[in-house]
């Protein structure tokens, strides 16, 4: 094999060669393939297709021609990159769902919104649309520069005159090397109005431009949610715009509904969207859809029908579809375009400024071109006028000349004519020698002089030129402008909140004695039959009952306050919904409790921003605090500090108030203080609080509650040895905060220390739990009503080494009330006060009772007589002691 000549071998470092070659390739892709020019909004392939259509005379008034002919001509002359890329680009320009203002008028199958491809180019035909002519208008008047094509045999435009702002009108998308562009389409009327405003006020702000240009206007219409993404994109060139389908909920008879989708987001494949919905229904990720069909047609337009089950919530299903399917998606704006041949990220104003400058250049160059042509014509007419004035001499000179060249030279010398004038005289027909033709030449000459003056005035005054640009843009707006298709919905629709996907319904959340939590619909309880009195049998490790309960909406908030002074927050729907028989899930699986942290209070709240409601806290060491409810509106999953206190202290209870209640604090040594809530100054969320009650040695707070000034409620006291009593709230006079309180029971070895102090109405049941796991349920109304100093009556018999550990209020069984076994709980009423609500807690089948206590009536009567005799003397002694303490 013959060796190559040495001169043809060029040794290069492979690293340098790779670097330079890749950079050359990258720049070629960026500049000559993937990015649009800021002036005409076209990539090279689109520009070449439109120029090829223009050169072939495929205007809207001509018949269609085969797409294969167009593609072949463009590929052969301007774009040697394969026919498929050219045809695909042309197809997209013909799709009214891809281009806001299609630039190609296609005949045949040019694809669909379902992702169907266009027919082969040998079957389809095309021509230019009317608006495309405005992109090419004046292209032959030296308005733009032409460059050589790929082989140097043809000339092609470097940019089109673009008499309307196509970059923003039709948008653009493309992926280059190291960068990409994605520009949304806009409404032509709004765009031209924006350009006009910019031309009148170069210092206009983007906010002012947005008064003319509301936002993108997609060819598939649909909705845009909010303006924040639009504003960010217009200001910085980058942003995310939320797009949503237009859907309505229709009634279809029989109490059933259907969701009808009539517009879908831009660039969404309708067929894939429907497949996604069907997949979610099949996988049971969306429930309640019974039928799904595509009724789209040329007559009705887009129409996707989703039938909804009778018992399903159509609004919730639609919100789920928005979140989980392309019914709602985003358009990522990245406004990169070629500016002076270089890729640049531009904002809205910069895009319009570059376009306006381009139009001024086009109009200026066209004016200069027209001026040159007008002056050339005037020059010819001046020669013809001279010839008509000396017609006999002209004819004689021509007759005497032997050749055309001699005649031309003779005319130039004798009449001081230019070569062009002399040639025009020689070319003049004899019929122009008539008087009528002479008048026409004179009139044309005078018109040309006026026209030349106008053109020179345009070039001499920038404002006159700018006004001409405005007039031409206004004309295009009036001819091609249309109404906005895409509706912009205001109101902060950036994301669907979880509650938008969940039906709002009344629920019950229960927290058990053993810290298991669950939720159930209120309707589940109401459907139950009455259960038996007594206690369901359980193993020792499984003994449990509902210790706290709240009723609320799935969209309401639940605040969990722990013994360590922290607060956690959940939405109602965030608590798992389980069956009635289920014991629930450990509360630590729902909220991230710290070690040794126990829920002390659970409160349901609808509006955490309320300025009229307060939370009152009480700790074991007698500290009390009042804080505005609004301080707890922003609680994260990890919880936050609700009250600060010493290490040896802990939170006992929290109550929600209206700010006008009386506070009741009770201690284990049977002291109780009552003082107005108004004496507590509202403190911050993490504040420590102030002294609520002065504790004697060894004493601690065991209960916190609230009461109205004229309350008919009673104070229930239960002691560790199983004794209890009821005393009217009004037997406890108001005193100053921080006092030692007054006696609420006589503590002896017989009844033991107080374990529970709370308010009751007399309509509740009481659940009493011992340290041995024995549980008893009894009617509060069966507990004797005694004076403050009474010891109370026996509520439960205890064995050796047993004591009462927990007491919980439960709504009593009463035939005349609800015929349901319901538990008392507190929630916020409209006036901000805590109100009693009910929900069933007993199972339908009571099971085997492990302990049922019958109160000995004779023993109780005897105890009562002894206590009544002592009550009066104890009151007198206590009042004297209290007075001395306060002094």
Swiss-Prot record:
GO CC aspect terms: chromosome; cytoplasm; DNA topoisomerase type II (double strand cut, ATP-hydrolyzing) complex
Q: Where in the cell is it found?
A: Cytoplasm
Q: Name one GO biological process term.
A: DNA-templated DNA replication
Which stretches does UniProt call biased (Acidic residues)?
A: 813-823
Q: What is its main location?
A: cytoplasm
**Domain named Topo IIA-type catalytic: which ranges?**
35-501
As its record notes, the protein acts as a catalyst of: ATP-dependent breakage, passage and rejoining of double-stranded DNA
Please list where the region (Disordered) is annotated: 811-865
Motif range for GyrA-box? 528-534
For this chain, one GO molecular function annotation is:
ATP binding
Q: Report if keyword Transferase is assigned.
A: no
* Database matches in Gene3D superfamilies: 3.30.1360.40, DNA gyrase/topoisomerase IV, subunit A, C-terminal, Topoisomerase II, domain 5, Topoisomerase, domain 3
Task: Tell me the active site.
Answer: 123
Q: Please give one Pfam family short name.
A: DNA_gyraseA_C
Broad class of enzyme this protein falls into: isomerase
Keyword tags: Antibiotic resistance, ATP-binding, Cytoplasm, DNA-binding, Isomerase, Nucleotide-binding, Topoisomerase
Query: Could you tell me the superkingdom of the organism this chain comes from?
Result: Bacteria
Per the UniProt entry, the Enzyme Commission number(s) are: 5.6.2.2
What is the protein's quaternary organization?
A: Heterotetramer, composed of two GyrA and two GyrB chains. In the heterotetramer, GyrA contains the active site tyrosine that forms a transient covalent intermediate with DNA, while GyrB binds cofactors and catalyzes ATP hydrolysis.
Could you share any additional remarks the record makes about this protein? Answer: Few gyrases are as efficient as E.coli at forming negative supercoils. Not all organisms have 2 type II topoisomerases; in organisms with a single type II topoisomerase this enzyme also has to decatenate newly replicated chromosomes.
Q: What does this protein do?
A: A type II topoisomerase that negatively supercoils closed circular double-stranded (ds) DNA in an ATP-dependent manner to modulate DNA topology and maintain chromosomes in an underwound state. Negative supercoiling favors strand separation, and DNA replication, transcription, recombination and repair, all of which involve strand separation. Also able to catalyze the interconversion of other topological isomers of dsDNA rings, including catenanes and knotted rings. Type II topoisomerases break and join 2 DNA strands simultaneously in an ATP-dependent manner.
Q: Which family does it belong to?
A: Belongs to the type II topoisomerase GyrA/ParC subunit family.
Q: What is this protein called?
A: DNA gyrase subunit A
Q: Which organism is it from?
A: Staphylococcus aureus (strain NCTC 8325 / PS 47)
């Amino acid at each position: 094999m013959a060796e190559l000549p040495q001169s043809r071998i060029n040794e290069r470092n492979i690293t340098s060669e790779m670097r330079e070659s890749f950079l050359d390739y990258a720049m070629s892709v960026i500049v000559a393939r993937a990015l649009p020019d800021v002036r005409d909004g076209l990539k090279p392939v689109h520009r070449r297709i439109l120029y090829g259509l223009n050169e072939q005379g495929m205007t809207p008034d001509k018949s269609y021609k085969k797409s294969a002919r167009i593609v072949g001509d463009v590929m052969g002359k301007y774009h040697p990159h394969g026919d498929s890329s050219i045809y695909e680009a042309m197809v997209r320009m013909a799709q009214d769902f891809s281009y806001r203002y299609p630039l190609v008028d296609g005949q045949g199958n040019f694809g669909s919104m379902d992702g169907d491809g266009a027919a082969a180019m040998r079957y389809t035909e095309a021509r230019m649309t009317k608006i495309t002519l405005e992109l090419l208008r004046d292209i032959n008047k030296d308005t733009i520069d032409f460059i050589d094509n790929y082989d140097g045999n043809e000339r092609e435009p470097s940019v089109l005159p673009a008499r309307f702002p196509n970059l923003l009108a039709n948008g653009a998308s493309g992926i280059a090397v190291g960068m990409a562009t994605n520009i949304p389409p806009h409404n032509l009327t709004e765009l031209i109005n924006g350009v006009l405003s910019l031309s009148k006020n170069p210092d206009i702000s983007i906010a002012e431009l947005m008064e003319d240009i509301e936002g993108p206007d997609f060819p598939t219409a649909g909705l845009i949610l909010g303006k924040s993404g639009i504003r960010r994109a217009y200001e910085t060139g980058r942003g995310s715009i939320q797009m949503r389908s237009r859907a309505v909920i229709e009634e279809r008879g029989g109490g059933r509904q259907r969701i009808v989708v009539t517009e879908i987001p831009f660039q969404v494949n309708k067929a894939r969207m429907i497949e996604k919905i069907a997949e979610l229904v099949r996988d049971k990720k969306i429930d309640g859809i019974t039928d799904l069909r595509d009724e789209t047609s040329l007559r009705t337009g887009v129409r996707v029908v989703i039938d909804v089950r009778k018992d399903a919530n159509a609004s919730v299903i639609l919100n789920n579809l928005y979140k989980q399917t392309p019914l709602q998606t985003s358009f990522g704006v990245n406004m990169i375009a070629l500016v002076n041949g270089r890729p640049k990220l531009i904002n809205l104003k910069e895009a319009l400024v570059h376009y306006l400058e381009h139009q001024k250049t086009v109009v200026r160059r066209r004016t200069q071109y027209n001026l040159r042509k007008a002056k050339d014509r005037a020059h010819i007419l001046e020669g013809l006028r001279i010839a008509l004035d000396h017609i006999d001499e002209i004819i004689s000179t021509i007759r005497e000349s032997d050749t055309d060249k001699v005649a031309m030279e003779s005319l130039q010398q004798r009449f001081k004519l230019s070569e062009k004038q002399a040639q025009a005289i020689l070319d003049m027909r004899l019929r122009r020698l008539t008087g009528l033709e002479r008048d026409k030449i004179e009139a044309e000459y005078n018109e040309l002089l006026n026209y030349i003056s106008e053109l020179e005035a345009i070039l001499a005054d920038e404002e006159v030129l700018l006004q001409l640009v405005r007039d031409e843009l206004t004309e295009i707006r009036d001819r091609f402008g249309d109404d906005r298709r895409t509706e912009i919905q205001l109101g902060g629709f950036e994301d669907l909140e979880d509650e938008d996907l969940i039906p709002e319904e009344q629920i019950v959340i229960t927290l058990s004695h053993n810290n298991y939590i669950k939720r159930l619909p209120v309707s589940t309880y109401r459907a139950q039959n009455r259960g038996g009195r007594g206690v369901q049998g359980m193993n020792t490790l499984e003994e449990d009952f509902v210790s706290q309960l709240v009723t609320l909406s799935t969209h309401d908030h639940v605040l969990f306050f722990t013994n360590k002074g922290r607060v956690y927050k959940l939405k109602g729907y965030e608590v798992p919904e389980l069956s009635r028989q289920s014991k629930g899930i450990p509360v630590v699986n729902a909220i991230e409790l710290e070690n040794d942290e126990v829920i002390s209070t659970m409160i349901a709240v609808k509006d955490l921003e309320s300025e009229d409601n307060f939370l009152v806290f009480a700790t074991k060491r007698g500290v009390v605090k009042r804080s505005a409810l609004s301080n707890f509106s922003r609680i994260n999953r990890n919880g936050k500090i609700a009250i600060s206190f010493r290490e040896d202290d802990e939170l006992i209870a929290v109550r929600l108030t209206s700010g006008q209640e009386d506070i009741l604090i009770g201690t284990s040594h049977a002291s109780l203080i009552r003082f107005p809530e108004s004496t507590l100054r509202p403190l911050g969320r993490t504040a420590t609080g102030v002294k609520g009650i002065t504790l004697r040695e060894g004493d601690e707070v065991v209960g916190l509650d609230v009461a109205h000034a004229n309350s008919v409620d009673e104070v229930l006291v239960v002691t560790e040895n199983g004794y209890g009593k009821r005393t009217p709230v009004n037997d406890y006079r108001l005193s100053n905060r921080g006092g030692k309180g007054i006696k609420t029971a006589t503590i002896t070895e017989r009844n033991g220390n107080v374990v529970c102090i709370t308010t009751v109405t007399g309509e509740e049941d009481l659940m009493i739990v011992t340290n041995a796991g024995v549980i008893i349920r009894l009617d509060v109304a069966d507990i004797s009503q005694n004076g403050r100093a009474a010891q109370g009556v026996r509520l439960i018999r205890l064995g050796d080494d047993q004591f009462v550990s927990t007491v919980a209020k439960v709504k009593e069984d009463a035939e005349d009330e609800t015929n349901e076994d319901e538990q008392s709980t507190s929630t916020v009423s409209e006036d901000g006060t805590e109100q009693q609500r009910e929900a069933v807690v007993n199972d339908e089948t009571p099971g085997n009772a492990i302990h049922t206590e019958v109160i000995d009536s004779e023993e109780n009567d005897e105890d009562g007589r002894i206590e009544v005799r002592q009550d009066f003397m104890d009151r007198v002694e206590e009042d004297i002691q209290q007075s001395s303490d306060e002094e």
